[in-house]
Amino acid sequence: MGLIYAEIELINGGDIELVRRGFMDKDEIKRMWVTALVDTGSYMLAINENIQEQLQLPVVEKRKAQLATGQIIECDVVAPVELRFKNRQTTCRAMVLPGDAEVLLGAIPLEDMDVLIHPLRQELIVNPEHPYFAQMKMK
């Protein structure tokens, strides 16, 4: 299987809450579309410093991360990030990789959105068994 990319929308989850509470107008929500590498070997969503800056996502902690090269680096973790793909969405934390690193869409947000990798078409798809809404087991 080759590399699989997906167009996803990233939104500042704090802005969504400010709109809900009436402190911000809906058109002020910081959001952007990005192309993410679908990476089932990564646990979390990983964004880069440029995206963090544009969305003004607050740092909630620091964590160590092991890169594909084996190198261990310390990264900021930002939250909340709302992530949208087709008719699916999830709210999650994101690791911030240095510079203009590639966005990685990891296993946890993939599972939460109930999306799958289609190996023949080499694309991310909505789970055909649950096409209208995400479904997960609670046992």
Where are these regions (language model features)?
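Pepsin/retropepsin-fold aspartyl endopeptidases
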Residues: M1-K139
